[in-house]
């Protein structure tokens, strides 16, 4: 099972050097045998707001690394023309000498679609066609479009990428249908434990691999990457107290984002909006505290190396191929960087234990 770093910052504090953790983490990952660095696409909210364009942050990661894969986790494809996605990531592929990869998401927050409002209703149904177009462009195939004069033109993107095929994952919060869709189309899966338990994840991975084998045979490589909130230390209770307050802020920020998403959904989200807005501050604190306890105990990788090894064993048994360690959930940058030494020891211990 591979290790990578994942970023999805809750930018709730003013920092002049707000990308220091990204760049120091990228160098750490490159030097310590990690597989990849993932950065997301988020818009119009402090939750993830450092990352409006993963191709830009990916280019920065490419510039300070030599070996580690540079990935989007994820590109919200309906917000962009497929040609722009192929062009931007071909640049990243060239800057990194063939290390680019992208997870593709359909998007969910209506406010994000202020960028491409015409794509909101078809964001899910058109996703596979968009991925197919990106893959064709990556292979140097031409696509037919209409230019500004109303004429049909055949276009090929530049610069030519280094890799003959673009590694692509399909992002899902746990939908069984999306797991199977990824398998049918020969895509990897990027997922998380925010709405699913490890046992449920194992069942979905099994269905994904079955669909992959049925439709792709032995000609491809099924791959499941799991985003996992991570902080490793030398004492479990010390880790708990280190992450409690920042991670609780992170969860509260996520709660606010859900409220805004419900508001943006208009009539469809009216009932949820009323319910969420009627939650008292005391009840909100209770919900956040409960969520923290659940994530800490069952849905994150927190604690000592020995304790985190047990979580890794569960994930490997579930069929996870790569643990994408989410490290930027509000803990002070210096503390996260100091904790990298323990994460490196976890990585090395796992490799020694499994032989790979």
Where are these regions (language model features)?
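Flexible, glycine-rich active-site loops centered on histidine and acidic residues
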Residues: 1-17, 78-149, 188-190, 194-202, ...
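N-terminal beta1-alpha1-beta2 module of alpha/beta enzyme domains
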Residues: 1-64, 69, 164-166, 341-342, ...
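Hydrophobic faces of well-ordered beta-strands that scaffold small-molecule active sites
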Residues: 3-7, 37-39, 70-72, 100-104, ...
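Active-site mouth loops of central-metabolism enzymes
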Residues: 7-19, 75-83, 163-174, 230-233, ...
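Short, acidic/polar
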Residues: 16-28, 88, 172-180, 305-314
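Conserved, mostly hydrophobic/aromatic
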Residues: 29, 33, 41, 61, ...
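Glycine-rich, proline-tolerant flexible connector loops at the mouths of alpha/beta enzymes
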Residues: 36-57, 61, 76, 108, ...
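An alpha-helical appendage that flanks or caps ligand/catalytic pockets
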Residues: 121-157, 199-320, 351-354
